[in-house]
Amino acid sequence: MTQTLAAALVPKAELHVHIEGVASPDLVRELADQHGVDVSGLFAEHGSYAWTDFAQFLAAYDTASRVFRTPQDYARLAETYLRSIALDGAIYAELTISPDHAAASGLSYADYVGGLAEGIARAQAATGIEARMIAVGVRHFGARAVEQVARQVATQPHPLVTGFGLAGDETEGHPANFARAFRMAAEAGLGLTAHAGETAGAESVTAALDFLQVSRLG
């Protein structure tokens, strides 16, 4: 037995992956052509995504996300990704989802989650892998936008959406600004997580723990 095969046989869990971020350049190009979305400047000469720092990465992420326009697009994305990691031995995944990015493409929260849930179900039927979703607000969109995501998740519960979090540019907004959103999510029974310590120091981690009452840091 080769080491590669042996590694694939070990059961694994993927606990931190942003669903739009798993899209391959080929898929993004295909959907951009299909939906007539301008993605100029998104790719480097050799075909990969073009970014050199975290701010450019976030901009590239936003651009690539715009090509997903229908629930079927998201079902395809979720199914393709989950099937791929199942081949590597994954039996469980938690997908970070961004209702703000879906809304920017004209999708309602219900259609967005419904499309992803369909893809999850298809992947599970094919491979046995299970998945759940963590809905995140984007901190550089502002506290009001993050609260809107928390409100959507709380008032439109879905059995596969089990968590709420905070993502985006860590330099935009102190965690205290988002405490209300996290209280709303906690009252709805959701698990809480936040990105902290990526581009800021240890004080960002401390603030996330103090003001957001998270049980996990990403």
What is each of the regions a protein language model found here?
Residues 1-190, 199-204, 209-211, 215-216:
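Metal-cofactor-binding active-site regions of metalloenzymes
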